[in-house]
Amino acid sequence: MRNLTLLTDLYQLPMLNGYFEKNIHEDVVVFDMFFRKNACKSGYTIVCGIEQLVDYINNLQFPEEDLKYLKSLNLFSDKFLDFLRDFKFTGDIYSVEEGTIMFPNEPVITVKAPLYQAQLIETALLTIVNFQSLIATKASKVCYAAQGDPVFEFGLRRAQGPDAGIYGARAAVIGGCKATANVLAGKMFDIPVVGTQAHSWIQKFDSELESFEAYADVYPDKCLLLVDTYDVLNSGVPNAIKVFKNLKANGHTPLGIRIDSGDLEYLSVEAKKMLDEAGFSNLSITASNDLDEYTISALKSGNCAINSWGVGTKLITSADSPSLGGVYKLAASYQGDEIVPKIKISEDPEKINNPGYKKVVRIYNKENKAEADLIMLHDEEINTSQPLTVFHPTYTWKETTFEDYTIKELHKPLFVNGECKFKSKPIIEIQQYVQDELNTLWDAYRRLTCPKTYKVDLSQELWDLKTNLLGDKIVQKQ
């Protein structure tokens, strides 16, 4: 990965310079990355982009050309710029595994590092993880709507730039898509690629039939034909059937057809009848054309004959929910070996962070269904031989007690004392992990509209800490 050290908001660097001038830059602090609302109006968010975050951290450095540029801004002391010359990340980063399902206000990534290091990485960390998590979650919803039909990512040409196209394709496959049309993403991440022909192929020939015959001649064993250039039912499908019969007579198996416009439900049903009558009942009928999870769900409920889906613009841009509002907040500062918790208060209760150095534990019932998450201080333990009572962090009278349960701590080390502990996994393996994670959720949390809210509670110790800090801040204001 290229050096992205200067991929940051300008205010980070003057803060670093200020910390340096005040000689507090080496103070050890704890930051949490979390989000306040799920991606894509979903009941959950799939964490994605961890491998790229690790690459970013591993490549942090200030080469001479960067230092020269920073000097030209006339914002930084020469002493500070000399200090940056030897920059190396030396802290700890703990994160949930890539593909883990998470929920609002839970620490997704926790950084414990010298202040200047922890502050510098905020912007890049957020842009990497926010975007890929958004697209992975959107892809998961689209695939859920498809009810097991294969979904292909077709969005590169509509992505908001090359990086969004490349890393969006990665995230989409992690979220459940079977393949991408993005060749570079296929090469970079070793993920399946798909594609056949555009309307321009059909238009270039004197007739639609001639174009189909030419394509079948070149790709007799990978022949999927685009049938909506002129007239799906009166031209496209009949011509495709002629070509398919010829392929079959010569020992080849055609793949199917794609419809990219029109009334997809009606056209697919009628096309299916024609294919069945011609003896091609097992062929794929792929639909594209501005699809998303809601359109696919409506088509499936209408008994369409589509059995694979190419989803582009509304997936790669997450069109109806185009950002994940992940944030990165100071949670604690060390004074020697003592942890001093930090809290940000706000008139908006949603923006009051959970203080301290924390971890997240997931609680499962005996059927291995996720029942609740518990945010705890990092040194707390749970005795699973005893009943566990959790309560809503705001409506504290709402309690749930678990008796026959198991737990899993969600965070794993990415870096310890600057040493990388992360082990890369194949994308398809991460995709399977996502499916395993989703299988632990009740269907109510996966509804496309109005999903049930998953329980995320605070331990008694953390709740007491937060309440006391809020009380102290209120007293200070008086």
List each model region and its residues.
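Ordered alpha/beta subdomains of enzyme catalytic regions
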Residues: 1-221, 248, 253, 329-478
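Glycine-rich phosphate/ribose-binding loops and adjacent secondary-structure elements
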Residues: 200-371
